[in-house]
A protein has these predicted regions:
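Short beta-strand elements at the ligand-binding edges of bilobed clamshell
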Residues: 1-2, 16, 47, 115-127
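Hinge/cleft segment of the Venus flytrap/periplasmic-binding protein
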Residues: 10, 17-21, 36, 125-162
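Short beta-strand->loop
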Residues: 15-24, 48-51
Length: 162
């Protein structure tokens, strides 16, 4: 946790990026994450809706105030495209990347995970995705990112760091 908890407040300060505001999957993913992570030491800096869109996620994230952006230690996204939009923002601004988590099983996310730039993504499997996102956050909180080899939970892929 110490490596990720930059401000040493004992919590991971995160931004949650949802899909469409009234979309069933976005509601379910967000509700599931919030319910399953309630016992984790997390602090929500903001919740944005980006309609599953990379460019919109970039735009909405860039509209957060500078303090929220600089305080962000993790970004949890309802899909990989929105996670990549946040990644694009950090890269364009030459900022250190926070922990970024997505959902979907996209090839580009796989490449970013393998390069070590993005922490992880989980399979678009309704039964398991929320629990796996929470498990990823637990590993981050416990400082087990090096030991936690399987960072991409997705059928047919299971990407592991060597």
């Amino acid at each position: 946790r110490n490596r990720v908890d930059k401000d040493k407040n004992g919590k991971i300060d995160y931004v949650l990026i949802e899909g469409e505001e009234d979309h069933y999957d976005a509601i379910r993913r967000t509700k599931g994450f919030l319910e399953n992570s309630k016992d984790l030491p997390l602090n929500t800096l903001g919740t944005l809706s980006a309609s599953w869109n990379r460019q919109l996620a970039y735009k909405k994230f860039s509209q957060l105030d500078n303090n929220a952006i600089s305080s962000t230690e993790a970004v949890i996204c309802n899909n990989d495209d929105m996670a990549l939009g946040v990644y694009d923002y950090y890269k364009e601004k030459n900022l250190a990347l926070p922990i970024i988590l997505g959902i979907n099983n996209s090839q580009e996310m796989n490449e970013k995970i393998m390069s070590g730039e993005i922490y992880g993504s989980v399979d678009n499997n309704m039964d398991n995705q929320v629990l796996r996102i929470v498990k990823c956050m637990e590993s981050v909180l416990n400082g087990n990112t090096k030991k936690y080899k399987k960072v991409w939970y997705s059928t047919p892929y299971a990407v592991t760091r060597e």
